[in-house]
Design a protein with these regions (language model features):
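Short helix C-cap/helix-to-loop transition motifs enriched in small/turn-promoting residues
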Residues: 72-75, 85
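Short S/T/G/P-rich N-terminal loop/turn motif that feeds into the first structured element of a domain
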Residues: 1-51, 58-68, 81-182, 186-204, ...
C-alpha cells in the first residue's frame, strides 16, 4: 500500500469552502482513478488554516500514474484560489522598468510514503464525524530500519490495537527522505487519542524503540535524563494531530 499527503495552507476566508470543494470535486475525481482506495481531508488541530489531503493507494505505480495523468495537476490548479498568501513577496521588473512586488501563494507540498506495516485494512466507508488522525514523525538510525519495523509490528501495533478508540495503525516509510518514517493512527475521537497520550503508553512505546532512532535523538534523551531539562533537536519525534473533515472509501 502507498500513502500520499498533499499539504495545503488555506486562506481563512475559504476554510469552510474547502470542504465542499473536496466533497464535490476531489472525491468524485479520485473515485474514478484506478488504485485509489481512500481519500480524506484532515485539518491541523493547532493551525486551523493547515489541511492535508490524505489518499491511500494499492501500489506506488498507480499513484504515480495518477500524478502523470494530469488529473492531479488539474485539482491542484482548482485549489489555488483557496490558498493563503506566503509571507514572501516576488519582485519583478515591469515593462516600463519599474519594480513590482507581488504576494507569493503558499504552494501545496506533496509527500509520499510506502506502508511498511499495518494493523488491518484501509479505513472503512463509515465516516465517523469525530474521527481523529495522529501522525508521529521520526528519524531512524542508519542500519536500524529493519529492527524498528520488527518492533513496530511486534510491539507497537498490538499495543495500539488494544487501546480504546484506536481503529487503524500504519507504519509508513518516506519515499523522499532517507530513514524518515511516520506512524499514522486513526482514532474514533480526539478524546481517545488524548487519553492514550495521558495514560503514558506513548512514552512507554517510545522507550521501547528509542535505541533504533537517530543518534541525535538518543543524545537528546540522554542529555534530558542527565540534566532534568528539556532539549530540542532537528531530529525530535514530531507529533501532529488532525481532525477528519470529510472522506470516502472507494473499494
Amino acid at each position: 500500500m502507498f500513502v500520499r499527503f498533499v499539504q495545503l495552507k488555506v486562506s481563512t476566508e475559504y476554510l469552510k469552502t474547502l470542504q465542499g470543494f473536496y466533497e464535490k470535486i476531489v472525491i468524485p475525481e479520485l473515485q474514478k482513478i484506478s488504485g485509489c482506495q481512500y481519500a480524506c481531508l484532515i485539518q491541523n488541530g493547532n493551525s486551523a488554516d493547515e489541511f492535508v489531503s490524505m489518499t491511500f493507494w494499492d501500489t506506488k505505480k498507480e499513484a504515480e500514474d495518477y500524478e502523470k495523468s494530469g488529473v492531479y495537476q488539474s485539482l491542484i490548479n482548482q485549489t489555488k484560489p483557496f490558498l493563503a498568501e506566503s509571507s514572501e513577496w516576488k519582485i519583478k521588473l515591469s515593462d516600463d522598468f519599474e519594480l513590482k512586488y507581488e504576494p507569493v501563494t503558499e504552494e501545496p507540498v506533496l509527500k509520499e510514503y510506502s506502508v511498511a506495516a499495518q494493523s488491518g485494512d484501509k479505513p472503512s466507508d463509515e465516516q465517523n464525524p469525530r474521527m481523529y488522525v495522529r501522525i508521529v514523525s521520526a528519524k531512524v538510525k542508519e542500519g536500524k530500519m529493519d529492527d524498528f519495523k520488527k518492533l513496530y509490528a511486534d510491539v507497537v501495533i498490538p499495543t495500539l490495537k488494544n487501546t480504546k478508540g484506536c481503529q487503524y495503525v500504519y507504519l509508513t516509510e518516506s519515499m523522499q527522505e532517507e530513514n524518515q518514517i511516520i506512524s499514522l493512527t486513526i482514532w474514533d475521537s480526539k478524546e481517545d487519542a488524548e487519553q492514550y497520550e495521558k495514560s503514558g503508553r506513548f512514552a512507554e512505546l517510545t522507550d521501547k524503540v528509542k535505541h533504533t532512532l537517530s543518534e541525535l535523538f538518543q543524545w537528546k534523551m540522554a542529555l534530558e535524563k542527565e540534566t532534568g531539562k528539556k532539549a530540542k533537536t532537528s531530529e525530535d519525534l514530531e507529533v501532529s494531530r488532525y481532525s477528519v473533515v470529510t472522506g470516502k472509501s472507494f473499494h
